[in-house]
Regions:
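Hydrophobic, helix-length membrane anchors
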Residues: 147-181
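Surface-exposed, acidic/Ser/Thr-rich flexible loop segments
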Residues: 17-104, 117-118, 122, 132-138, ...
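Structured, non-catalytic alpha/beta "coupling" segments that mediate domain-domain communication
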Residues: 125-128
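Short, conserved secondary-structure segments in the cores of folded domains
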Residues: 112-115
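Short alpha-helix capping/helix-loop boundary micro-motifs
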Residues: 108-110
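Alpha-helical transmembrane helix bundles of large polytopic membrane transport and channel proteins
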Residues: 1-16, 41
Length: 181
């Protein structure tokens, strides 16, 4: 049995606001002891695309931080509307350093991480031709690709610096171990 009022195999869903944005919280109720559990959560997102004059943009946090448990493996599959060539679509992932981002086609995109600590998030950003979402309701009236590319480059540079620093710490640890310090 799960906790009182929280039957195993059920879930709750709530909408809220956090840090200036809308948040969707799903709480899954389950029991597990020395076992692996897999959860598949599928949902359709409406009105999440921002339509700029030069690109359409989807920027979405797939799973937030501050969960009660770590996630051993997480993957996200995103299906864009048909009509774009792969070279017209750009995508990025934000979250753990070990994550992977793949463009399978102009329509199918994939994010994956082998381990997501409870205090880390996984989000994705995609830009694609505006013609794919002519019905988008969030219109910015400005060009955005240049600023998006610049922002993503800054984050990539920051990530590279973090990886380099982690490598230096690892190398120093190995040297200290070899020297018996």
């Amino acid at each position: 049995q799960a906790a009182v009022g929280r039957p195993a195999g059920k879930y709750t869903f709530a909408r809220g606001r956090e840090a200036g944005g809308e948040v969707f919280n799903i709480v899954l109720y389950f029991q597990a002891k020395d076992e692996v559990r897999t959860f598949v959560i599928e949902y359709l997102v409406l009105d999440a695309v921002r339509l700029h004059t030069d690109v359409a943009e989807l920027y979405w946090q797939f799973i937030g931080r501050n969960r009660s448990v770590d996630t051993e493996f997480m993957s996200v599959s995103l299906q864009l509307p048909p009509g774009a060539q792969a070279e017209e679509v750009r995508l990025w992932g934000h979250g753990p350093l070990r994550g992977e981002v793949r463009k399978i086609s102009g329509e199918k995109l994939w994010w994956e991480t082998p381990f997501l600590p409870r205090d880390r998030y996984l989000e994705g950003r995609v830009v694609f031709p505006p013609r794919l979402t002519p019905q988008a309701k969030v219109l910015t009236g400005r060009a955005a690709l240049g600023s998006i590319l610049a922002e993503e480059q800054r984050w990539a540079d920051q990530r590279a610096a973090e990886q380099k620093q982690a490598l230096y710490v690892l190398a120093a640890s190995v040297v200290c171990t070899l020297l018996g310090w």
